[in-house]
Amino acid sequence: MALPVAPADRRLQPEPDEQVHLNHRELGELDLPQEPDTEGIPLNSPWTFWLDRSLPGTTAAECESNLKKIYTVHTIQSFWSVYNNIPLVSNLPLRWSYHLMRGERKPLWEEESNAKGGVWKMKVPKEASSLVWKELLLATIGEQFTDHCSPEDEVIGVSVSVRDREDVVQVWNGNASVVGEAKVLEKIYELLPNTSFKAVFYKPHEEHHAFEGGRSRH
């Protein structure tokens, strides 16, 4: 699915202290599409942007309560409206994350629709994070990973998390049992040939020590 070039950027600028609160009131003030989101070129499926902050030692319930829904996009036009109105990854404070998930599923390991899946996880240089995030977003909503997954699987999300030295990107899939048939990493390397990824691995959600059988953190 070919995607058009983004329209002129209309990004919000962060506060001087670079704190990105984006509470529910502020989310409502973003220049996002008005419901219903039906006009424009439809995506193959809806996708939801999420924002959260992950802190060591938080409980699963606290992790879920920190999660903020930004918007569910149904068209290419509404995707760009959201993307162009949220801060760049490079402007997010430490330990904040963006997620884009298929449908309205939450970026939580034990969410019923996620629990049997896992993630390809990799570290990226900070100067490359914004580009990597954008390219993976476009590949995801454009269903470019479809031919690189098992027929019994699909990519269901992508995340970027701001960390101390290098940032972390994750690509979520729905069925860890068939990951051996996937060529998702090869597609990522093809999309981003000049990016030096580090510590690249795949891990099923159920193998995380914090997997709690019904509630989770990422």
UniProtKB/Swiss-Prot annotation:
Single Gene Ontology BP annotation: regulation of translation
Stretch list, region Disordered: 1-23
Coiled coil: none
Keyword annotations from UniProtKB, A to Z: Initiation factor, Protein biosynthesis, RNA-binding, Translation regulation
GO cellular component: eukaryotic translation initiation factor 4F complex
InterPro entries in the record: TIF_eIF4e-like (IPR023398), TIF_eIF_4E (IPR001040)
Pfam family, one: IF4E
Recorded superkingdom: Eukaryota
Residues that, per the record, bind mRNA: 109-110, 163-168
Residue spans of biased composition, Basic and acidic residues class: 8-23
GO molecular function: RNA 7-methylguanosine cap binding; translation initiation factor activity
Oligomeric form and interacting partners: eIF4F is a multi-subunit complex, the composition of which varies with external and internal environmental conditions. It is composed of at least eIF4A, eIF4E and eIF4G.
PANTHER family assigned to the protein according to its UniProt record, in alphabetical order: EUKARYOTIC TRANSLATION INITIATION FACTOR 4E RELATED (PTHR11960), EUKARYOTIC TRANSLATION INITIATION FACTOR 4E TYPE 3 (PTHR11960:SF66)
Family of this protein: Belongs to the eukaryotic initiation factor 4E family.
Role according to the record: Recognizes and binds the 7-methylguanosine-containing mRNA cap during an early step in the initiation of protein synthesis.
Protein name: Eukaryotic translation initiation factor 4E type 3-B
Organism: Xenopus laevis
